[in-house]
Amino acid sequence: MASTDTISDMLTRIRNACAVRHSTTQVPTTKMTLSIAKVLKSEGFIEDYSETGEGINKMLVLTLKYKGKTRQPLINTLQRVSKPGLRVYSPSKKIPRVLGGIGIAIVSTSHGIMTDREARRQGIGGEILCYIW
């Protein structure tokens, strides 16, 4: 089934896969989901990602990361902030810190998708997509 909000769909699939301790999960590939996967990998929330399939059936396979013998997920919370019905924008000086810097906010800027720290460092504001910790 086609989803109109691919970011929420991606976050929900990751949240559900972490809840049942799956090692991988698949999400439909878009430029946005690919950029978010790059940020998640660079911040250490997922091990890796790869693309499978061709054309309209292209999927992004995310390899999730767990800690310890009990396999506790590294991602505790995924919270969507800006939604299709209510967009949330923030200038660079007012981008919120997530849990005092422990978590990250993923921001869509004119220079691409990046973390809140990168956006503040570059002095760029944008749309706050989600919080992850």
UniProtKB/Swiss-Prot annotation:
The keyword RNA-binding applies. Signal peptide: none annotated. GO terms for biological process: translation. One of its GO terms (cellular component) is cytosolic small ribosomal subunit. One of its GO terms (molecular function) is structural constituent of ribosome. The keyword rRNA-binding applies. Pfam families: Ribosomal_S8. InterPro entries: Ribosomal_uS8 (IPR000630), Ribosomal_uS8_CS (IPR047863), Ribosomal_uS8_sf (IPR035987). Keywords: Ribonucleoprotein, Ribosomal protein, RNA-binding, rRNA-binding. Belongs to the universal ribosomal protein uS8 family. NCBIfam families: PRK00136.1 (NF001109). One of the primary rRNA binding proteins, it binds directly to 16S rRNA central domain where it helps coordinate assembly of the platform of the 30S subunit. Part of the 30S ribosomal subunit. Contacts proteins S5 and S12. This is Small ribosomal subunit protein uS8. It comes from Synechocystis sp. (strain ATCC 27184 / PCC 6803 / Kazusa). The gene is rpsH.
